[in-house]
């Protein structure tokens, strides 16, 4: 994608602290990329699947975002918004409201609480994870084992939007 919007993208950065029962991830920020995928084609979800495949984050599903707070301890997650618009809550109850639209991407580090507050009828998301990671669906406070899993989860080798050397690889660094 030489010269593409995705290649030149700079994300919005959202740092989330623990919030009630939602652990979030104090070391790794949420990254939100705006308008990085052209969704004017016949199958915009396929454009996200192709992008994520090229950048080493194989796409796993097409659907939406659950309407309840949840987080993952066993996977970092990228959400590609292929159609419609939505208002999400990131970080758990009373967290940060984020509006997303077709063409946007959100990268959620393990532990990040997220839920859909409202969405247009055509809202469609492509979800992907780094190789070797599979999401669990957590809706309660983390046990010590769950917290250790979040802290020890390997960092992705590439940014799901820009690939090797993309913003994630510099913004997500071990201390």
Residue ranges and their predicted role:
Residues 117-175:
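Double-stranded beta-helix
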Residues 72-89, 107:
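Short, conserved beta-strand element in jelly-roll/cupin
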Residues 1-69, 169-175:
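A short, N-terminal "cap"/entry segment at the start of jelly-roll beta-barrel domains
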Residues 75, 88-98, 115-116, 134, ...:
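A structural preference for long, well-packed, hydrophobic secondary-structure segments
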Residues 64-78, 93-94, 100-101:
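A short beta-loop-beta micro-motif enriched in histidine and acidic residues
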Residues 100-120, 129:
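Conserved metal-binding segment of the jelly-roll/cupin
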